[in-house]
UniProtKB/Swiss-Prot annotation:
PANTHER family: PTHR38813, TOXIN RELE1-RELATED (PTHR38813:SF1). InterPro entries: RelE/ParE_toxin, RelE/ParE_toxin_dom_sf, TA_system_RelE_toxin. Keywords: Toxin-antitoxin system. Toxic component of a type II toxin-antitoxin (TA) system. Its cognate antitoxin is RelB2 (Potential). Belongs to the RelE toxin family. Disulfide bonds: none annotated. This is Putative toxin RelE2. It comes from the Archaea. The keyword S-adenosyl-L-methionine does not apply.
Length: 91
């Protein structure tokens, strides 16, 4: 099992608090329980590398997307927004 270094940006925490409770729980489970058991981003369920943006990825959780950056074993979570908003505000 790989040990990730995490950083949650203030924007990520703020976005998360504004989501419906059921979506919040899914995202918390994914971020804190499932992702730490993966070795690299392609192993994370529903993840895609963003085109034209080095080291930036998104994870699909229903109609919501988690925007993060992965470099050198470190994940920085930037945003979690509805699919209509995420690409306007991330990266």
């Amino acid at each position: 099992m790989k040990q990730w270094k995490y950083l949650l940006k203030k924007s990520f925490i703020k976005d998360l608090k504004e989501l419906p409770k059921n979506i919040q729980e899914k995202i918390k489970k994914l971020v804190f329980e499932e992702i730490p058991n993966k070795n690299n981003p392609p192993e994370i369920p529903n993840v895609k590398k963003l085109k034209g943006a080095d080291s930036y990825y998104r994870i699909r959780v229903g109609d919501y997307r988690i925007g993060f950056k992965y470099e050198n074993g470190k994940i920085v979570f930037y945003r979690v927004l509805h699919r209509k908003q995420i690409y306007k505000r991330f990266p």
